[in-house]
Amino acid sequence: MTEQRFNHKISRRTFLKVCAAAAAAGLTACGKTQAAAALPELTVGSDNYPPFVYLSNDSTPTGIDVDIATEAFARMGYAVRFEIIDWEQKTKLVESGAIDCIWSCFSMDGREQLYRWVGPYMVSRQVVAVNADSGIETLADLAGKTMMVQSTTKPEEIFLGGTDPRIPQFGELLSAEDRSVQYAMLNCGYVDAIAAHEAAILRYMQDCNANFRILEEPLLVTGIGVAFALNDTRGLDEKLTETFAAMRADGTMKQIVGKYLPDPEKYLEVDALEP
């Protein structure tokens, strides 16, 4: 099995700014208001990954994870800034303190001991997509085919690991640092299939009118979470866990997910995930 890496680095080291510093107002003795100090800011390391994190038409960062993070951290007394990072360097960045956490549809499966996790807060299916007219119907049909994935993702780990008996021998496995490359390669017929989070593929199909078909059998059904460094002792993970519980209870999670995905309840059924 051959792996080829396409070094299409995202040159746009765009810094996504969310939630400018907020000011609280308090009444003075004279009945006038007085602005309080700006909220402390947390930096979230992320990938450009619609519908979880992306730029809207007016260049405002938006998406499921942006909205959840903004609301959750505001309840905790923080502002938040999303920074697009080199995804392959995410662990080094969070451990060094360059970012406060990793938050971008980040699968927890197999990484449980690598970080301080908050979650899972959503369920995600890792799936394989092909062109609609492809003869590939099952995972077994991928034998001898050319597959493309984003580097350092769960699909790449699954395919390179060789431990899933459902996965046949590919003709070639390609990895790209920029996830958008795999969509273009499939659209043009340069690869036979791609693998990624189902919600991300569906969003691309909607936005770009792509005629893809998702195989019925998923590669993996997993929980996604927020990752803090193991050496982070500030207690942010514990406070965020409590805040998530409150947001689930008051319906905020469902409301946010429903803005971007149909049938939001199925994405929030984290209790049904296998331990």
Functional labels for PLM-detected ranges:
Residues L55, A69-Y78, P155-A176, M205-N209:
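Ligand-binding cleft/hinge of the Venus flytrap
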Residues V66-R75, I136, A140-T146, S151-K154, ...:
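Extended ligand-binding regions for polar small-molecule ligands
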Residues T70, A79-D141, P218:
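Acidic, polar ligand-binding/catalytic clefts
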Residues M1-I10, V18-T28:
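N-terminal secretory signal peptides
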